[in-house]
Regions:
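N-terminal non-catalytic structural scaffold regions of very large proteins
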Residues: 1-206, 242, 253-256, 260, ...
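Conserved mixed alpha/beta core segments that line enzyme active sites in large multi-domain catalysts
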Residues: 1, 184-255, 320-344, 349, ...
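Short alpha-helical segments and helix-capping/turn motifs at coil-helix boundaries
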Residues: 132-135, 233, 415-417, 514
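Solvent-exposed alpha-helices and their adjacent loops that cap or buttress functional pockets
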Residues: 114-116, 228-230, 314, 423-425
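A short, sequence-level motif marking secondary-structure junctions
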Residues: 42-44, 251-254, 369-376
Length: 683
């Protein structure tokens, strides 16, 4: 409570106190012993209009700055108990970052002045549309600071309330995990799937009005708040979900039009003149040549979902032949997961099977992990492998920003030596025609295409053991398995120490093991054990002899690598939280199996854009159709023309024709110069 006169002064309202009643043409408020006279300006009247509902005549002018009068006013508009909450708002509403933003826009920075300014905006009928993002900010990493301030503000509010209640033991405390908890509970938080580098970048470029202090209620998003506004041009792309989340989650453009590190947005008059692929399109739209100008907008939204979110790396894939350069920019725009970028100028000092070591000119060293890693696909319920490789050798120099290692299934330089380019799909010869082999959204593919578009899929099987359980048999990472094969066999602990001793002695006796009532962990697929991970809440010293040996063998292998690259060894005993919740004195073992998944009947492929096909038949090898022009070249798939027309994806036939022209032009030039090539397009 700052008092009425102070509030009027901060609102820059000229006022005076008079004992006699002012003329009717003046604005005034009557008190018990006088009148408060103020300028009858529209903004002043709107701000002070609420006082006419309050019985000011019961109070003298001397009482207008007192807390009792303020509490009585609160009682009229709600309840007196809200006073403590309003005090907290007064102290905490304007955080340092908000104050900086207000100064940038030349807005008031003090709580009372901000409320007065907000009231003055009601004077005119001018308004901004719900979807007009002018004046909004693009916030990224600063959200962590918001969570910190939120946690501190909540703690301070509780402390202030205890102080006002005269609690002598009042303390300002904060939960150790408060910031992490707020981040995890935020409506914009989600797991990062590692299917492709394209998905990684689009996940980073996803924006929403949801989140901390945002519009988090689904009923807030009516049609008028889901449409695309002209103020979004060169800031937000047209791509969005095409289901219930349409217009709620959006994608930023590649080169978003922002000002300053705080991400200020302005509605520029020349925005249309500045429109181009980088400024106007999302990365997925830029990787879909002709798509935004020739496809139905609804299909463009579907392209974003099918290409960015559902696309997966395959056995063989190629870059675009028709490109605007976005596919070459992509490896430099993502993190080091799929393409490792040098932080400074430097040189390669060591290359081993598991890692590469580099030394920068500043004297700093860096290590590139060349091992195969299992990463999560949070949307699909399976995992994938990511492995970086390098084309460099020991002693080779590089510049800051150069890509020194990359995932070869994601990138290649096939269409330009040294120009690393994103592999978006398999370049294949198809026929667009009316045929029973491809009716509506069904299609037929060749056996070679089915193999080229195969993927290595990883599935997980886990087992939770007590620390005294006895391991009878186990397989190791790298071992081949068949579906249903036992990978890990153990028996529950017994209380009798003599019985435990007997069990430990029988470990090497397979016949005896089979007769025991053991528990087995079997493989779900036929493939290879890719990795084994262990999470334990107990030290190995407390485990059974066989379980301790199993865990230590895996620990030692990991520690050998960490010592070689001079990285700290992680704590082996973990708290019983997260995935280990309610797992005291237990060991969680995760087995990851990789299997080779080729295309089969019922699988879906995307020809391009949002044009998908469900496989109804696979041509056997040697039975594929061929064209009369290139008799050595087999057709990889048949695409029904009705599917192209019905889905209004005009970019597909145009891009197909352009690809054909480029391929045949390349061959014609090679024919002129006598350069041999494979006319089967299989190399």
């Amino acid at each position: 409570n700052v008092g009425l006169t102070t509030a009027l002064e901060r609102a820059k309202i000229r006022f005076d106190f008079q004992e006699k009643r002012p003329p009717r043409n003046e604005a005034f408020i009557k008190f018990k012993d006088g009148y408060l006279v103020y300028e009858p300006d529209a903004s002043n009247i709107i701000l002070l209009n609420g006082l006419y509902k309050f019985n000011t005549e019961d109070y003298s002018i001397k009482e207008i700055d007192s807390k009792p009068m303020w509490l009585d006013a609160l009682d009229l508009y709600g309840a007196k108990y809200k006073a403590d909450g309003l005090d907290s708002f007064y102290n905490l509403m304007i955080d340092p970052m908000t104050e900086e933003v207000c100064r940038h826009y030349q807005f008031p920075t003090e709580y009372i002045e901000i409320l007065a300014y907000a009231s003055s905006l009601l004077v005119t009928n001018e308004y901004n549309r719900h979807v007009d993002i002018t004046g909004n900010r693009f916030r990224t990493n600063e959200r962590i600071a918001h969570f910190v301030y939120k946690a501190l503000a909540t703690s301070y509010g509780n402390y202030l309330r205890e102080v006002k209640n005269n609690r002598k033991a009042a303390k300002m405390t904060i939960k150790r995990t408060a910031v992490i908890d707020l981040a995890m509970e935020d409506s914009t938080m989600s797991d990062l799937s590692m299917l492709t580098p394209l998905l990684e970048l689009e996940s980073a470029n996803a924006v929403s009005f949801k989140g901390l202090s945002g519009m988090n209620s689904d009923r807030s998003y009516q049609l008028d708040k889901r449409t695309y506004d002209k103020s979004m041009l060169n800031k937000l792309a047209m791509s969005t979900g095409f289901a219930g989340n349409v217009g709620i989650n959006r994608q930023t453009t590649i080169n978003m039009d922002l000002e300053g590190t705080k991400g200020y947005m302005y509605n520029r008059e020349d925005a249309l003149d500045e429109a181009n692929d980088a400024n106007t399109l999302s990365i997925t739209e830029a990787l879909t040549p002709l798509g935004t100008t020739h496809d139905d907008p609804f299909r463009t939204a579907m392209t974003f979902i099918q290409t960015a979110k559902h696309g997966i790396r395959t056995e063989k894939s190629d870059p675009l032949l028709v490109s605007d350069g976005a596919d070459q920019a992509l490896p430099y725009m993502t993190s080091d997961i799929f393409s490792f970028k040098a932080k400074e100028d430097g040189k390669v000092t060591k290359i081993k099977d598991d890692y590469m070591e580099v030394k920068y000119k500043s004297g700093k060293t860096d290590v590139v992990d060349l091992r195969s890693h299992v990463e999560k696909n949070s949307d699909g319920g399976f995992y994938i492998n990511i492995k970086l490789d390098t084309e460099l050798s020991v002693g080779k120099s590089f510049k800051a920003g150069d890509i020194i290692a990359f995932d070869k299934s994601s990138y290649s330089d096939d269409y330009g030596l040294g120009r690393l380019t994103y592999n978006i799909g398999k370049l294949s010869k198809i026929a667009i025609l009316y045929t029973d082999e491809g009716f509506e959204d069904s299609t037929t593919v060749s056996a070679s295409l089915a193999e080229d578009m195969a993927s290595d899929i990883v599935v997980k099987v886990e087992a939770l053991l007590d620390k005294t359980d006895v391991v009878l048999q186990h397989m190791n990472a790298g071992d081949k398995v068949i579906e249903g094969q036992k990978m890990f066999t153990y028996i529950n602990a017994v209380d009798d120490p003599d019985a435990t001793t007997v069990l430990n002695k029988l470990i090497d006796d397979k016949a005896a093991i089979e007769s025991l009532g053991n528990i087995s962990v079997t493989s779900k697929v036929t493939g290879v054990i890719q990795d084994i991970k262990i999470y334990s809440t107990v030290p190995t010293s407390e485990m059974s002899k066989s379980l301790r040996k199993f865990c230590e063998d895996i620990y030692n292998k990991e520690e050998k690598y960490l010592k070689a690259v001079r990285k700290p060894i992680p704590e082996r005993v973990l708290p019983a939280i997260g995935k280990l919740k309610n797992s005291e004195d237990k060991i969680l073992i995760e087995f990851y199996m990789t299997y080779h998944d080729t295309l089969s009947l019922g699988d879906k492929i995307v020809f391009f854009s949002a044009l998908k096909g469900t496989i109804k038949r696979i041509y056997p090898k040697g039975k594929e159709p061929r064209s009369e022009f290139r008799k050595n070249e087999t057709l990889k798939s048949l695409l029904p023309l009705s599917g192209v027309n019905a889905r209004m994806v005009g970019s597909v036939p145009i891009l197909t024709a352009l690809n054909k022209v480029i391929v045949e032009l390349d061959r014609a030039v090679k024919d002129i110069y006598g350069i041999k090539y494979n006319d089967g397009l299989d190399n």
